[in-house]
């Protein structure tokens, strides 16, 4: 390649070998790199860069002082590109034995393509203020306070009583690193003698968002009667949306489900019928009503069916089950092989995440029963495109739940031991209570306790190393405490919840989320 470059003139093309198998990622580092070993820790090391690259929604963070916990990073945006990483070597050969002006040096260039760059990270934002744990003395001398502020090991009581200069970092750094134009409006000027009207609901705008036109009927446990038919607005909305044979078929399938079983959760419906989520929001209020409180809360019930008057509805009651984790149970939240539905660490804050553009769903797609995936030839079959797995509503022994908080119906607990607990009072159901329904008191607590033990055994079989160190400390204690999920808990259970159950673990109140879809 070097010889060819020497023979060709200026501006001539040179053939090079393209190594397509070498895909690379480029980081436009905002500085002069003299030592790669010191540069990598500022980006989180190879492991940190790999973790950010694996998630296309994350931004690459650069810490100027990696060991300083008060260092605020600058963030790089991720872009797709089609670039080449080219290595060029200039070689100069001087003629031996020739001195003076008659000496000519032979210059050659070696060019080599090291790989193809498909992803590039660019630092385009502004850097925020940096706060240093430094104290300025009277004479202008700066003294570091890191050894007095940071706890690198367990300290004695004297460490907390030492005299220190006041050092208060900001409670929050800037959430945005890009300049934004703010258009200030002049203050409204009124004529002389104008008085502001009294504050009331009549002259205030935007007290709440507009009600969504899904027209669902909500029923509380203490309500005397249940609706026998949907609202006329719900029927009209579904007739307006139901414009193709696919929608009519889905309606027939949903009616058959409610004929077989009068009470369903939305996840259970999604696991049995393939229907677009937006269509299901409109269809469910046309077929069933929604129970807010009681043992059938967060469930959809067929119009005209009152579970409070039918003991057979016991098997359709809901069980709010949450996986409890903590060191006393033998595994930490990070060790649990069950993901959280959402986490405070994954929220899309502008400082850490560059949100990807969402795919739009057109009215044509909804009318045809399609989603935002393009043409029907490149999609999954319509019979299974929107279907969920059975594990979202069925509990089986030996299988872990997909999330740390689950809402099961009692009939979907496919374990013989659990069904025995449920059917202990068959034929002797005297009354239906808001807490236990048609079951015996504390039935839900016993079910959670048994399910927790099953999950502990499953985790032990999948990851035995987690329990090797905790077995001695536990002293053979196998029982895993449970969380009732009810309002009527004693003080001891509340203390355990505060200790073990963290909101950041991602448990999500599905009932509130579902209600918000219709309010």
UniProtKB/Swiss-Prot annotation:
GO terms for biological process: 5S class rRNA transcription by RNA polymerase III; skeletal muscle cell differentiation; transcription by RNA polymerase III; transcription initiation at RNA polymerase III promoter; tRNA transcription by RNA polymerase III. It is found in: Nucleus. The modification N-acetylalanine is found at residue 2. GO terms for cellular component: nucleoplasm; transcription factor TFIIIC complex. Keywords: Acetylation, DNA-binding, Nucleus, Transcription. Its main location: nucleus. GO terms for molecular function: DNA binding; RNA polymerase III general transcription initiation factor activity. Residues 465-519 are annotated as: Disordered. Residues 484-500, 507-519 have a biased composition (Acidic residues). The keyword Cell wall biogenesis/degradation does not apply. InterPro entries: TF_IIIC_su-5_HTH (IPR019136), TF_IIIC_Tfc1/Sfc1 (IPR040454), Tfc1/Sfc1_N (IPR041499), TFIIIC_tauA_Sfc1 (IPR042536). It comes from the Eukaryota. Part of the TFIIIC subcomplex TFIIIC2, consisting of six subunits, GTF3C1, GTF3C2, GTF3C3, GTF3C4, GTF3C5 and GTF3C6. Interacts with BRF1, GTF3C6 and TBP. Involved in RNA polymerase III-mediated transcription. Integral, tightly associated component of the DNA-binding TFIIIC2 subcomplex that directly binds tRNA and virus-associated RNA promoters. This is General transcription factor 3C polypeptide 5.
């Amino acid at each position: 390649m070097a010889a060819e470059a020497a023979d060709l003139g200026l501006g001539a093309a040179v053939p090079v070998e393209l190594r397509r198998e070498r895909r690379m990622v480029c980081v436009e580092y905002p500085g002069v790199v003299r030592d790669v070993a010191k540069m990598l820790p500022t980006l989180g090391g190879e492991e940190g860069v790999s973790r950010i690259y694996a998630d296309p929604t994350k931004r690459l963070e650069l810490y100027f002082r990696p060991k300083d916990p008060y260092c605020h990073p600058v963030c790089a945006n991720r872009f797709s590109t089609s670039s080449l990483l080219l290595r060029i070597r200039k070689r100069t050969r001087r003629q031996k034995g020739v001195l003076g002006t008659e000496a000519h040096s032979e210059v050659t260039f070696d060019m080599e393509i090291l790989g193809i760059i498909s992803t590039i990270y660019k630092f385009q934002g502004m850097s925020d203020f940096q706060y240093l744990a430094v104290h300025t003395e009277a004479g202008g001398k700066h003294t570091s306070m890191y050894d007095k502020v940071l706890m690198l090991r367990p300290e004695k009581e004297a460490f907390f009583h030492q005299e220190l200069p006041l050092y208060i970092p900001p409670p929050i750094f800037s959430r945005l690193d890009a300049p934004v134009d703010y258009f200030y409006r002049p203050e409204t000027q009124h004529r002389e003698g104008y008085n502001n009207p009294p504050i009331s609901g009549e002259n205030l705008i935007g007290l709440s968002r507009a009600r969504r036109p899904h027209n669902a009927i909500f029923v509380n446990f203490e309500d005397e009667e249940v609706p026998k038919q949907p609202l006329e607005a719900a029927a009209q909305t579904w007739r307006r949306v139901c414009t193709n044979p696919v929608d009519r078929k889905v309606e027939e399938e949903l009616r058959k489900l409610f004929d077989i079983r009068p009470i369903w959760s939305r996840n259970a419906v999604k696991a049995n019928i393939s229907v677009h989520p937006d269509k299901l929001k409109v269809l469910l209020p046309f077929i069933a009503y929604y129970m807010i409180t009681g043992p059938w809360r967060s469930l959809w019930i067929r119009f005209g069916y009152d579970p409070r008057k039918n003991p057979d509805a016991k098997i359709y009651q809901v069980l709010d089950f949450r996986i409890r984790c903590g060191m006393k149970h033998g595994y930490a939240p990070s060790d649990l092989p069950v993901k959280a539905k959402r986490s405070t660490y994954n929220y899309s804050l502008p400082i850490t995440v560059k949100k990807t553009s969402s795919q739009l769903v057109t009215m044509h797609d909804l009318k045809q029963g399609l989603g935002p995936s393009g043409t029907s030839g490149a999609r999954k079959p319509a019979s299974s495109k929107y279907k969920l797995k059975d594990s979202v509503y069925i509990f089986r022994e030996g299988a872990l739940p997909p999330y740390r908080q689950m809402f099961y119906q009692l009939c979907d607990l496919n374990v013989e031991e659990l069904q025995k607990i449920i059917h202990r009072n068959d034929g002797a159901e005297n009354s239906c209570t808001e807490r236990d329904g048609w079951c015996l008191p504390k039935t839900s607590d016993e079910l959670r306790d048994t399910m927790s033990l099953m999950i502990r055994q499953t985790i032990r079989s999948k990851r035995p190393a987690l329990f090797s160190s905790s077995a001695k400390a536990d002293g053979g204690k196998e029982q895993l405490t449970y969380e009732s999920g009810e309002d009527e808990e004693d003080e001891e259970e509340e203390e355990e919840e505060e200790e073990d159950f963290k909101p950041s673990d991602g448990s999500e109140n599905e009932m509130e989320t579902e209600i918000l879809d219709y309010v």
